C-alpha cells in the first residue's frame, strides 16, 4: 500500500515538472548527516518520504503523512527554466492537494515549513518541507478466498405484544425442494 502511494506521488511530481528538476526521488537512508547533506547537492530537486501515520476514521484505514522535501537555490525563480521554492511549492500543492495516489485518497495539505538554518541559506540553498495527509486503507488480514461459504447461522426474532421470542438455525445455502411445497 505504501509502495504504491509513493510510486504514484513520485510519478505525479515528474509529470508536474518534466525535466525542470534535477532529482525526483524517495528519501532513503537512515537520516544521518550524510543523508541530509545529500538533499542540498542537486537543487532544484524534490525528495519524498513517508512520515508515519495516525488513527483513521475506521479500523480499516490510517491517516498517512507524506513529506516532500523541496530544495532550490532561489526563493522566487522562473516558472519554466529555473524554478525557485515558491514555484515548486505552488505547483506541488496544486498537483497533489485533493487527489488520489495509489490506494491513498484525499491528500490534504497540512503544512509548509522552511527547514533551512542560516548556514544553508548563506550557502545559497533553501530547503522547504511540504506535508500532506491522506487516507490509506489497511490490507485485509483475512484472505477471503480461504473462507468456507457461509452455511448456517442462529437467528432470533422478537414479536410485539409480549409474544415470546422465536429462534432457529437457518441453513443459508440449502436447496429448496419447490415440488414438496406445492
UniProtKB/Swiss-Prot annotation:
Q: How is loss of this gene reflected in the phenotype of the organism?
A: Accumulation of free heads as well as free tails longer than normal and variable in length.
Pfam families reported for this sequence? Phage_Mu_Gp37
Q: Which GO terms describe its cellular component?
A: host cell cytoplasm; virus tail
Q: Per the record's keyword annotation, is Methyltransferase included, yes or no?
A: no
The listed locations are: Virion; Host cytoplasm
Main location per UniProt? virion
This entry's comment on induction and repression of expression is: Expressed in the late phase of the viral replicative cycle. Expression of late genes is activated by the viral late transcription activator C.
Which keywords does UniProt give here?
A: Host cytoplasm, Late protein, Viral release from host cell, Viral tail assembly, Viral tail protein, Virion
State the superkingdom: Viruses
The UniProt entry's GO biological process terms, in alphabetical order, are: viral tail assembly
**Its biological purpose:** May stop tail tube polymerization by capping the rapidly polymerizing tail tube once it has reached its requisite length and prevent its depolymerization.
What is the recorded name of this protein?
Answer: Probable tail terminator protein
Which species is the source of this protein?
Answer: Escherichia phage Mu
Amino acid at each position: 500500500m505504501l509502495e504504491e502511494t509513493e510510486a504514484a506521488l513520485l510519478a505525479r511530481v515528474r509529470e508536474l515538472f518534466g525535466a525542470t528538476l534535477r532529482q525526483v526521488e524517495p528519501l532513503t537512508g537512515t537520516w544521518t548527516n550524510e543523508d541530509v547533506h545529500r538533499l542540498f547537492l542537486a537543487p532544484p530537486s524534490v525528495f519524498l518520504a513517508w512520515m508515519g501515520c495516525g488513527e483513521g476514521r475506521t479500523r480499516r484505514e490510517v491517516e498517512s503523512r507524506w513529506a516532500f522535501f523541496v530544495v532550490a537555490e532561489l526563493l522566487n525563480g522562473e516558472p519554466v527554466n529555473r524554478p525557485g521554492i515558491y514555484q515548486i511549492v505552488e505547483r506541488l500543492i496544486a498537483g497533489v492537494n485533493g487527489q488520489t495516489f495509489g490506494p491513498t485518497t484525499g491528500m490534504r495539505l497540512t503544512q509548509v515549513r522552511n527547514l533551512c538554518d542560516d548556514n544553508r541559506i548563506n550557502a545559497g540553498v533553501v530547503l522547504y518541507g511540504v506535508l500532506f495527509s491522506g487516507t490509506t486503507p489497511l490490507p485485509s488480514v483475512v484472505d477471503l478466498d480461504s473462507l468456507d461459504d457461509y452455511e448456517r447461522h442462529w437467528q432470533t426474532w422478537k414479536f410485539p405484544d409480549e409474544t415470546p421470542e422465536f429462534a432457529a438455525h437457518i441453513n443459508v445455502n440449502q436447496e429448496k425442494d419447490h415440488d414438496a411445497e406445492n
